[in-house]
Each structure stands twice: as structure tokens, then as C-alpha cells.
């Protein structure tokens, strides 16, 4: 049986981009040394090995995001307890848009993405 997908990834990303603030690279470069911002790298281990990451960024594989944010999860990471702005990023701004929207819906704030 063929599945009837009623909302594809493009629509989900569009909704996320309508909801969450998007920063451009130039804006982010000025924030890299600002301690009020935490950069969250959503790429997987292979991407990090191949391409590296922003110095000081926290690596959070996309598949673990909700578990690491939720304080009731046994996988919770304390980095998500801070009163800072969370800047999510990935390779194409797709995962980062979806992640920032999800994090916002979970109550993490403020959030944005590259």
C-alpha cells in the first residue's frame, strides 16, 4: 500500500522558517565569542569528522535533540539548562529549522537557526 503523505518535508521546513528566527552567516560570526549564545551543531558524527565544526559549538545529533533538551529524560544534557540563546545549525538549514522549532515548542527559549 502506498502511503499518503499529507505534509512533506518542504512544508515542515517552511512552517519552521515562518516560526523561528533565521540568522545569516555574517550575523553569526559576530556572535561566536558572545557568551550569551550557544551554537548547537546538529550534524552526525560522519559530517563532523569530514567537515569539522564551529569552535566551541556543542554537538547534538538531530536524533537525540528532544531527549537531551527534556529535563525528565535520562539522556538530558545540562547545556540545555542555561539562560542563553540557542543557535542551531546543520549543513543545509533544514535540520536546524526543524530543530529550532521543536526546541521552541518544548519551551527552550530563545532559539534561532542558521
How should each PLM-predicted stretch be described?
Residues 49, 67, 97-98:
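Alpha-helical elements of the RecA-like P-loop NTPase motor core of helicases
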Residues 67-73:
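Short, charged, surface-exposed secondary-structure boundary motifs
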Residues 52-54:
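Glycine-rich loop at the start of a catalytic domain that most often binds anionic cofactors/ligands
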Residues 1-50:
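Flexible, polar/low-complexity N-terminal or interdomain linker segments that lie immediately upstream
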Residues 62-66:
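Short, acidic/turn-prone active-site loops that include or flank metal/cofactor-
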Residues 33-39, 56, 85, 109-110:
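Short active-site oxyanion
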Residues 73-114:
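Catalytic cysteine-centered active loop of the rhodanese-like fold, especially the PTP/DSP P-loop
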Amino acid at each position: 500500500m502506498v502511503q499518503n503523505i499529507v505534509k512533506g518535508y518542504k512544508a515542515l521546513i517552511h512552517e519552521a522558517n515562518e516560526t523561528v528566527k533565521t540568522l545569516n552567516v555574517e550575523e553569526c560570526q559576530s556572535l561566536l565569542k558572545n557568551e550569551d549564545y550557544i551554537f548547537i551543531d546538529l550534524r552526525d558524527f560522519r559530517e563532523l569528522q569530514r567537515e569539522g565544526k564551529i569552535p566551541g559549538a556543542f554537538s547534538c545529533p538531530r536524533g537525540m535533540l528532544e531527549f537531551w533538551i527534556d529535563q525528565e529524560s535520562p539522556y538530558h544534557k545540562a547545556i540545555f539548562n542555561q539562560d542563553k540563546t540557542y543557535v542551531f545549525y546543520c549543513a543545509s538549514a533544514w535540520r536546524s529549522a526543524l530543530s529550532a522549532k521543536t526546541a521552541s515548542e518544548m519551551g527552550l527559549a530563545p532559539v534561532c537557526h542558521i
